[in-house]
A protein has these predicted regions:
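Membrane-anchoring/interfacial helices and their immediately flanking loops
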Residues: 1-44, 421-423, 501-541, 545
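N-terminal membrane-anchoring/stem segments of glycan-assembly enzymes
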Residues: 2-135, 190-194, 290-291, 472-476, ...
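Hydrophobic alpha-helical transmembrane segments
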Residues: 29-46, 408-424, 443-453, 476-480, ...
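Loop-to-transmembrane boundary segments
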Residues: 43-62, 144-155, 452-476, 550, ...
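Membrane-embedded multi-pass helical conduit in multi-pass membrane proteins
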Residues: 68-97, 469-553, 566-624
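Internal catalytic domains of large membrane-associated glycosyltransferases
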Residues: 98, 102-450
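Alpha-helical membrane-embedding segments
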Residues: 116-130, 148-149, 161, 230, ...
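C-terminal, non-catalytic tails of nucleotide-sugar-dependent glycosyltransferases
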Residues: 439-460, 539-542, 619
C-alpha cells in the first residue's frame, strides 16, 4: 500500500515549512555522473544464520583462549619480563595484559546470539501503546532526513526511496527534510517531491538540535531516523514496526550497509593472476583463507565495512538489552524519547531550584523563592529529546536504557534495510572516526555509564567495552614500537626466546585465532583487525583532545570524495614503516656477522611485518 505523504501543520515563527505538492514518480536510478551509479543493483548479504553448534564451539574455544591467555600472562610477569631493561620489558607486558583484557571483554560481549522474534506490523496506535477507544487511530510515522550541506540531488534520491516504502496497512507516513543549511535548492527539491521541509534560524545543537526542532513540529508515533544519504528499502517499515508491539521497546536499530565499497579481488585469484602463480597461488590463497577467513585484495581500502560491528558486536548484545542506537537506520518510539526529555528537563530545574533555595530557613520564604526560581528556570532551560552531543545516538541510548521506572528495551534487527555511502578518502574517514572516538570518550569522562544507576551489570559491561576499545593506544603503541626498539638496540622486552616462550605463546595465539574465527564466522574481519591497529594516531588525538577538556565538535561527514594530499594524516605511520625497514636491515647485518642471536630476530621480524601490513594500508589509503 502506498504511504500517505504529508508534512507537519505546525511551525514556529523561527521555522520555515513548504507545503507539499503532488508526489513525483517512485525512485529513479541516480544520474550517471554519481560515482556510485554502477553499484545501484548491489544487494546486501543476509545476516549470518545462527548455528547452535558453531556457537558452542566458539564458547569452548573462547574459554580455552582465556585459560591459555591467563597462563601465558602469569608466566610473562613471573618468568620472562626483561627486568634488566624494565623500561621496555614492563611496558610490553602491561600492553599484553591490557590487550588481553580487551579480548576477555570481546568474548563476554559476543558470547551468544539471541535475535528478537519478529511480530506482525501493527495498524493502529492501540497496538503499540495505551490508547482509549476514542483516541485510537491509524498509526502515524515521521521519516526524518536531517541535512546541512549535502547535495540536494543526493537527498532527493533518499527521499524518493523513502516514498517507495510499503506497508500492509493504511497508516499515515510523513516524510520531512530537515535542512539546517536553509538552502533554496533543498527547499525546491522538497517541494518537487511533495514532502515536508523544516528549517530553523540557528544551528544550535547541530544534528541533535535539528532533530529536536523536527520533533517540535511533527507528531508521528514512530520516528524513522535517516541521514541525507540513507536510501531506505521498500520493506523497512513492515520489517521493523512489529517489534513495537512490545510496549517496552523504545527503539529498533537496523544495520548500516555501505553499497559503494570497493569489492577487491579474492586472494586465490589475485595470487594466481596478479602474481602469476597459477594453480599453486590459488591453492595457497585458499589455504590462507581457511585460517583467516575470506580475503579480498584491495577490498574496502578504508576499512568501512560495518558488518563486523553490526552482525557480530551489536547483534550479540541484543540478549542483554544492550545494543545501542547508531543514528541512521533506527526507528524510535516518540513516547520514549519525549518522556525521557521531560524527565531530564524536570531534573535540571529541580537541581537548580534546590541549589538556590535549600539554604533559606524561613519555610514561607523558601516556598515563594522556589516558585519564583522554578518559573525562571523553566524558561531558561530547554527540552532536549536528543542530547546535544556529538554522539547523540549512543548517549540517548544510555539515557533510555537507564530509566529504572520504564525499563525501556532496544532491539537490533540483523537484516540491512537501507543503503548508505561510505567515506571515499582518508580525510573524511579520519573526521568520522575522530568523532566516534572523541564522542564516546567524552561521555565516559562526563557521564560514565559504568556509574549510572539503572543500567544492568551486562549493560554496563557492554557500554564499558565500547569505551575501553577507545583506550587502545595504551597497548597498541607499545606493540608497534617494541620491535623497532629491538632492531635498533638489540634489547628485547622478553628475557629469552626459548622453548618455554614458544610453549606458552603459540598455544594461546593459535587458540585465540580459532576462537575469533568461530566467533566471527561468515564475517570479513581481516581489514577491521588491520585498521584497529592503524587507527592508533587518530585515537591518540581524540583521547588527548578529550582529556584536555576540549569540546568534540560535530562535523558533517562529506558524501563525496575530497581532493588533496593526505600524507600529513599518516606521517606517524610512514615514520614507523621507515624505522621498521631500516631497523630490520641493521639487525640483519648483525645477524650475518654473528653479533646477534637469530631467535629474537625471527620473532620480532614476524611481529614487525604484521605491524607493517596494518600500517601500510592506511598509507596507501592516503594516496588513493
Amino acid at each position: 500500500m502506498a504511504p500517505a505523504i504529508s508534512m507537519s501543520d505546525a511551525a514556529a515563527a523561527s521555522d520555515t515549512t513548504v507545503a507539499p505538492t503532488t508526489p513525483t514518480e517512485p525512485a529513479l536510478p541516480p544520474a550517471p555522473d554519481w560515482y556510485f551509479a554502477p553499484f545501484e543493483d548491489r544487494k546486501p548479504a543476509p545476516p549470518v544464520a545462527y548455528h547452535a553448534g558453531r556457537e558452542w564451539l566458539f564458547q569452548a574455544a573462547a574459554v580455552c583462549t582465556l585459560v591459555l591467555g591467563g597462563w601465558y600472562l602469569a608466566w610473562r610477569w613471573t618468568s620472562s619480563v626483561n627486568w634488566g631493561a624494565w623500561y621496555v620489558g614492563v611496558p610490553l607486558a602491561a600492553a599484553e595484559t591490557l590487550a588481553f583484557v580487551g579480548t576477555v571483554l570481546f568474548f563476554l560481549t559476543t558470547w551468544r546470539n539471541r535475535d528478537t522474534a519478529m511480530e506482525s506490523p501493527p495498524a493502529r496506535l492501540s497496538e503499540i501503546q495505551h490508547a482509549s477507544p476514542r483516541d485510537d487511530r491509524p498509526l502515524s510515522v515521521d521519516v526524518l532526513f536531517p541535512t546541512y550541506n549535502e547535495d540536494p540531488e543526493l537527498v532527493r534520491l533518499s527521499v524518493r526511496d523513502a516514498k517507495a516504502m510499503r506497508y500492509p496497512h493504511a497508516i499515515e507516513i510523513n516524510i520531512h527534510v530537515l535542512d539546517d543549511g536553509t538552502r533554496d535548492a533543498m527547499r525546491e527539491v522538497a517541494r518537487q517531491e511533495g514532502v515536508g521541509y523544516l528549517t530553523r534560524t540557528s544551528n544550535i545543537g547541530s544534528k541533535a538540535g535539528n532533530m529536536r526542532n523536527a520533533l517540535e513540529h511533527t507528531g508521528g508515533d514512530l520516528l524513522v531516523i535517516c541521514d541525507a544519504d540513507t536510501r531506505p528499502f521498500p520493506e523497512l517499515l513492515e520489517r521493523t514496526f512489529g517489534y513495537f508491539r512490545d510496549r517496552r521497546v523504545a527503539w529498533v536499530q537496523t544495520p548500516q550497509w555501505f553499497y559503494d565499497l570497493d569489492e577487491g579481488t579474492p586472494l586465490p585469484a589475485w595470487l594466481a593472476a596478479r602474481l602469476r602463480l597459477g594453480a599453486v597461488g590459488a591453492l595457497v590463497g585458499r589455504a590462507i583463507e581457511r585460517v583467516l577467513g575470506p580475503i579480498h585484495v584491495g577490498r574496502d581500502p578504508f576499512g568501512n565495512d560495518p558488518q563486523m560491528f553490526y552482525d557480530v558486536i551489536q547483534r550479540r548484545r541484543n540478549w542483554a538489552n544492550a545494543s545501542f542506537g547508531c543514528g541512521a537506520g533506527s526507528i524510535y518510539r516518540r513516547e520514549a524519547v519525549m518522556e525521557e526529555a521531560l524527565k531530564a528537563y524536570a531534573d535540571e530545574i529541580r537541581v537548580e531550584v534546590a541549589a538556590l533555595t535549600d539554604g533559606v530557613e524561613d519555610v514561607q520564604l523558601r516556598a515563594q523563592l522556589r516558585e519564583s526560581v522554578g518559573a525562571e528556570a523553566a524558561r531558561a532551560h530547554e527540552l532536549t529529546p536528543y542530547k546535544f552531543h556529538v554522539s547523540e545516538d549512543i548517549y540517548t541510548s544510555i539515557i533510555l536504557h537507564s530509566d529504572r521506572e520504564r525499563k525501556w528495551r532496544s532491539v537490533f534487527h540483523p537484516e540491512p534495510l537501507s543503503k548508505m555511502l561510505s567515506p571515499q578518502d582518508l580525510l573524511t574517514w579520519t573526521i568520522q572516526r575522530f568523532k566516534y572516538a572523541g564522542g564516546t570518550l567524552d561521555i565516559a569522562i562526563h557521564d560514565n555509564p559504568l556509574l549510572r544507576p539503572g543500567l544492568s551489570f551486562w549493560q554496563k559491561l557492554m557500554y564499558g567495552t565500547t569505551i575501553y576499545s577507545y583506550f587502545a593506544p595504551l597497548w597498541t603503541v607499545p606493540l608497534l614500537v617494541m620491535p623497532i626498539i629491538y632492531f635498533f638496540t638489540g634489547i628485547a622486552a622478553v628475557s629469552s626466546y626459548d622453548t618455554a616462550f614458544y610453549g606458552h605463546v603459540v598455544p594461546f595465539l593459535v587458540m585465540n585465532r580459532l576462537a575469533f574465527m568461530l566467533g566471527t564466522w561468515g564475517v570479513q574481519s581481516w581489514r577491521g583487525e588491520q585498521y584497529y591497529l592503524a587507527f592508533f594516531w587518530t585515537n591518540i588525538k581524540a583521547l588527548l583532545h578529550v582529556l584536555r577538556g576540549l569540546p568534540v565538535k560535530f562535523h558533517v561527514t562529506p558524501k563525496v570524495k575530497q581532493a588533496g594530499n593526505f600524507a600529513a594524516l599518516v606521517w606517524p605511520h610512514i615514520a614507523l614503516l621507515v624505522l621498521t625497514g631500516v631497523g630490520i636491515a641493521i639487525r640483519a647485518v648483525d645477524i650475518a656477522q654473528g653479533s646477534s642471536a637469530l631467535g629474537p630476530f625471527v620473532v620480532n621480524l614476524f611481529w614487525a611485518l604484521w605491524n607493517a601490513s596494518s600500517l601500510s594500508i592506511m598509507v596507501f589509503a592516503a594516496f588513493r
